């Protein structure tokens, strides 16, 4: 006889729910109902039941799951109840994430560099001005002191040069009528004067 097959003990995996979470269903209902002041709980429940395949459950079980989903959504900031817990439900506006403050460009080092160059230029300008002041000081002549007494011994009087005596010119007329000029010999007085000067 063929052996009997062992009975399979593995149970079939239970089929999960065919609908999304209650919170997502409520979000979808509010978006589609498009009411300005929010949607009432009754209208949201009707939309959820009509558009989702829910497992058969009692009305009390559905209401408890529905209320829990709204409460959790309010705590997480998904829903708003402006008129209290029994009032209409609205979707909370998501705040845009705060933009990080723009980083300041690192210009401190760049701005510091021109200052250094400016100080260097100023130092160079000061150095360039200093020689000018020295030159001006050098250019100013010191006041002349008292003239030094001439201590040098008086030089001997230079020997007088012999006096040049103009030789008198004698004009004579020849027989033919021509004029001739001849220098006369110096007189004895002139020769004596020159002799005295030489002795002195």
From Swiss-Prot:
GO cellular component, one term: nucleosome
The H15 domain, residue ranges: 18-93
Pfam families xref list: Linker_histone
Bias (Low complexity) ranges: 1-14, 94-116, 159-185
Ranges for region Disordered: 1-20, 78-200
Similarity remark: Belongs to the histone H1/H5 family.
Biological function: Could act as an H1-type linker histone.
PANTHER family (alphabetical): HISTONE 24-RELATED, HISTONE H1
Name of the featured protein: Histone H1
Species in which this protein is naturally found: Emericella nidulans (strain FGSC A4 / ATCC 38163 / CBS 112.46 / NRRL 194 / M139)
């Amino acid at each position: 006889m063929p052996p009997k097959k062992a009975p399979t003990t593995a149970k079939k995996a239970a089929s999960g729910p065919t609908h999304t979470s209650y919170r997502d269903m409520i979000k979808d209902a509010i978006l589609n109902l498009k009411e300005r002041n929010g949607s009432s709980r009754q209208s949201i429940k009707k939309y959820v039941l009509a558009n989702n395949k829910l497992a058969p459950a009692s009305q009390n079980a559905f209401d408890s799951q529905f209320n829990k989903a709204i409460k959790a959504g309010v705590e997480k900031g998904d829903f708003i109840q402006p008129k209290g817990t029994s009032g209409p439900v609205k979707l909370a506006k998501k705040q845009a994430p705060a933009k990080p403050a723009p980083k300041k460009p690192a210009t401190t080092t760049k701005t510091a560099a021109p200052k250094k160059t400016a100080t260097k230029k100023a130092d160079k300008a000061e150095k360039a001005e200093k020689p000018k002041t020295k030159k001006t000081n050098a250019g100013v002549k010191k006041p002349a002191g008292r003239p030094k007494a001439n201590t040098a011994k008086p030089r001997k009087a230079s020997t007088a040069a012999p006096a040049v005596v103009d030789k008198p010119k004698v004009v004579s007329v020849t027989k033919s009528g021509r004029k001739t000029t001849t220098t006369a010999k110096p007189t004895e007085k002139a020769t004596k004067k020159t002799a005295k000067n030489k002795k002195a």
